[in-house]
Amino acid sequence: MAARGSGPRALRLLLLVQLVAGRCGLAGAAGGAQRGLSEPSSIAKHEDSLLKDLFQDYERWVRPVEHLNDKIKIKFGLAISQLVDVDEKNQLMTTNVWLKQEWIDVKLRWNPDDYGGIKVIRVPSDSVWTPDIVLFDNADGRFEGTSTKTVIRYNGTVTWTPPANYKSSCTIDVTFFPFDLQNCSMKFGSWTYDGSQVDIILEDQDVDKRDFFDNGEWEIVSATGSKGNRTDSCCWYPYVTYSFVIKRLPLFYTLFLIIPCIGLSFLTVLVFYLPSNEGEKICLCTSVLVSLTVFLLVIEEIIPSSSKVIPLIGEYLVFTMIFVTLSIMVTVFAINIHHRSSSTHNAMAPLVRKIFLHTLPKLLCMRSHVDRYFTQKEETESGSGPKSSRNTLEAALDSIRYITRHIMKENDVREVVEDWKFIAQVLDRMFLWTFLFVSIVGSLGLFVPVIYKWANILIPVHIGNANK
């Protein structure tokens, strides 16, 4: 009986042990899972606790220093992402930049061991003290950058890199437009603090261009920064100036402005290649003059209205317009000479005959004109011959003499007209070569030195690019 009773009791004891072991296993698994989920939650709680402790008595309007005479040193740097536009008319330079600023905030320090090993936090810039560094030479009323988050380290180092879109004033020198080189500057400094309270330290002399997006019209030759101080009767104010030396890419203006202007100036030369009796000579000159006026108006819309300097292309257009005006005057004079005759003008002077009928044609490679004036003419009447005994013969001779004199007179008139026409041709040929020479020399003299100087500007390798 005792043996039979001990068997069921042992079985029940074994089942009880397995049930307890299973429950303990489930409880352990649940506890492990709960411990695994509690770790991120504890990090968030640590960061919440850190922020509450840091900003419980924090006042963002108060300069974060321990003593009144302590100064905050701001490490300042500039990175450019895009040169958006250079407005020559309004003398503005539009840029997208990043303002790199770093300083020590003694009120934002903590021990990472007390907050779960947290060493870096990110808070909005509106929640902490930030230096009021602005762009002094801004032209659109926006002096500050965009509000972004700051990166704060456990030792109190605050890093703030806000992006900004600036329209800064820039004095544009259009003397060598479109082969010009501009120097635009951006001046940064504190708006209210003097140097004894906030000092600016230049982080890097060169502007960071690692993320720069190329512009289709302008190329940055150099972008460097320098520190300066402005003093008045009581205080000194530090500032940082970044100078951007930019070079224009003139391909667009060369194709659509300079080459058409040069072509129009050479069209003026072709006016003198037309025959002197063609009235289209004046029409061609007038059309060229109107076209140059249109180009001058186009340039006036691009460049600023200034009386200090005259742009190179403007000088060339004015030179060409004077050139065309002179060609119109010369053409009118040549047409007038072409239509002269003995009945409208006096006899041609011997010096004019010698120069324009003999000397100049040889120099201009023209076919020599027949010398009708320096050839000795035979006397038509050598004296009184023997009297004819017949009256009919004398009458016939008188008639022949009359006809001969009339024909010779007509020939002389025709020769005078042809001589004037030939002089007009000589003038056209002379001014053709003269204007062609002046056009070539003037174009080369104006553009070649400037283009050579522009082409030899070296683009230095930027430090930021070298460190990529």
Curated annotation (Swiss-Prot):
<dbReference type="GO" id="GO:0034220">
    <property type="term" value="P:monoatomic ion transmembrane transport"/>
</dbReference>
<protein>
    <recommendedName>
        <fullName>Neuronal acetylcholine receptor subunit alpha-5</fullName>
    </recommendedName>
</protein>
<dbReference type="InterPro" id="IPR036734">
    <property type="entry name" value="Neur_chan_lig-bd_sf"/>
</dbReference>
<dbReference type="InterPro" id="IPR006029">
    <property type="entry name" value="Neurotrans-gated_channel_TM"/>
</dbReference>
<comment type="similarity">
    <text>Belongs to the ligand-gated ion channel (TC 1.A.9) family. Acetylcholine receptor (TC 1.A.9.1) subfamily. Alpha-5/CHRNA5 sub-subfamily.</text>
</comment>
<keyword id="KW-0675">Receptor</keyword>
<feature type="disulfide bond" description="Associated with receptor activation">
    <location>
        <begin position="234"/>
        <end position="235"/>
    </location>
</feature>
<dbReference type="InterPro" id="IPR006201">
    <property type="entry name" value="Neur_channel"/>
</dbReference>
<comment type="function">
    <text>Component of neuronal acetylcholine receptors (nAChRs) that function as pentameric, ligand-gated cation channels with high calcium permeability among other activities. nAChRs are excitatory neurotrasnmitter receptors formed by a collection of nAChR subunits known to mediate synaptic transmission in the nervous system and the neuromuscular junction. Each nAchR subunit confers differential attributes to channel properties, including activation, deactivation and desensitization kinetics, pH sensitivity, cation permeability, and binding to allosteric modulators.</text>
</comment>
<dbReference type="GO" id="GO:0043005">
    <property type="term" value="C:neuron projection"/>
</dbReference>
<dbReference type="InterPro" id="IPR018000">
    <property type="entry name" value="Neurotransmitter_ion_chnl_CS"/>
</dbReference>
<dbReference type="GO" id="GO:0022848">
    <property type="term" value="F:acetylcholine-gated monoatomic cation-selective channel activity"/>
</dbReference>
<dbReference type="GO" id="GO:0051899">
    <property type="term" value="P:membrane depolarization"/>
</dbReference>
<dbReference type="GO" id="GO:0007274">
    <property type="term" value="P:neuromuscular synaptic transmission"/>
</dbReference>
<dbReference type="Pfam" id="PF02932">
    <property type="entry name" value="Neur_chan_memb"/>
</dbReference>
<dbReference type="GO" id="GO:0045202">
    <property type="term" value="C:synapse"/>
</dbReference>
<keyword id="KW-1133">Transmembrane helix</keyword>
<dbReference type="InterPro" id="IPR006202">
    <property type="entry name" value="Neur_chan_lig-bd"/>
</dbReference>
<feature type="signal peptide">
    <location>
        <begin position="1"/>
        <end position="22"/>
    </location>
</feature>
<feature type="glycosylation site" description="N-linked (GlcNAc...) asparagine">
    <location>
        <position position="183"/>
    </location>
</feature>
<dbReference type="GO" id="GO:0015276">
    <property type="term" value="F:ligand-gated monoatomic ion channel activity"/>
</dbReference>
<keyword id="KW-1015">Disulfide bond</keyword>
<dbReference type="InterPro" id="IPR038050">
    <property type="entry name" value="Neuro_actylchol_rec"/>
</dbReference>
<dbReference type="GO" id="GO:0098793">
    <property type="term" value="C:presynapse"/>
</dbReference>
<dbReference type="Pfam" id="PF02931">
    <property type="entry name" value="Neur_chan_LBD"/>
</dbReference>
<feature type="topological domain" description="Cytoplasmic">
    <location>
        <begin position="338"/>
        <end position="429"/>
    </location>
</feature>
<dbReference type="GO" id="GO:0035095">
    <property type="term" value="P:behavioral response to nicotine"/>
</dbReference>
<feature type="glycosylation site" description="N-linked (GlcNAc...) asparagine">
    <location>
        <position position="229"/>
    </location>
</feature>
<dbReference type="GO" id="GO:0007268">
    <property type="term" value="P:chemical synaptic transmission"/>
</dbReference>
<keyword id="KW-0732">Signal</keyword>
<dbReference type="GO" id="GO:0035094">
    <property type="term" value="P:response to nicotine"/>
</dbReference>
<dbReference type="GO" id="GO:0005892">
    <property type="term" value="C:acetylcholine-gated channel complex"/>
</dbReference>
<keyword id="KW-0325">Glycoprotein</keyword>
<feature type="transmembrane region" description="Helical">
    <location>
        <begin position="317"/>
        <end position="337"/>
    </location>
</feature>
<feature type="transmembrane region" description="Helical">
    <location>
        <begin position="255"/>
        <end position="275"/>
    </location>
</feature>
<keyword id="KW-0770">Synapse</keyword>
<dbReference type="GO" id="GO:0099171">
    <property type="term" value="P:presynaptic modulation of chemical synaptic transmission"/>
</dbReference>
<keyword id="KW-0812">Transmembrane</keyword>
<keyword id="KW-1003">Cell membrane</keyword>
<dbReference type="InterPro" id="IPR002394">
    <property type="entry name" value="Nicotinic_acetylcholine_rcpt"/>
</dbReference>
<dbReference type="GO" id="GO:0005886">
    <property type="term" value="C:plasma membrane"/>
</dbReference>
<dbReference type="GO" id="GO:0045211">
    <property type="term" value="C:postsynaptic membrane"/>
</dbReference>
